């Protein structure tokens, strides 16, 4: 898996986003998915439930995206395959400095050295492509705004 082609993280996200978008009419997409900013709280701490057993693992990699080659994660329901996680993680690391820092049975959380600035709607759309489950109860406008204030990116899959 370490020899996988990792130059396609952006295309994987784009393709997954288009698949999500196909599930909605234009009106549903605009009103329900994009929506309006509801000013949700930033995420600057890991979302770990109290009482959860944690294991600190030192993974022998120089590039942080390669952690997915050692910790097999994904390939169920809508969760990307481990190779796709690795390509996406490389893309986000190179573009935003994001590193996968917490992986559980159904959650991946990325740490960023600082929140992202500028137009964050394209990043929110990438997040939706990565994990369509993240919008439950929210919308892209709110997620886009949240990204400007957050140093943790939270993703989960059913």
Regions found by a protein language model. Name each.
Residues 56-58, 92, 127, 155:
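Generic structural hydrophobic/aromatic packing signal, biased to beta-strands
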Residues 106-158:
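Alpha-helical oligomerization segments
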Residues 6, 10-13, 78-82, 120:
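Intrinsic-disorder-associated interaction segments
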Residues 99-104:
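Short beta-strand
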Residues 79-94:
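Short amphipathic alpha-helix segments
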Residues 60-78:
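Short glycine-/aliphatic-rich beta-strand segments at the starts of folded cytosolic domains
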Residues 1-66:
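Extended, low-hydrophobicity segments enriched in charged/polar residues
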Residues 94-97, 133:
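Structural alpha-beta junctions
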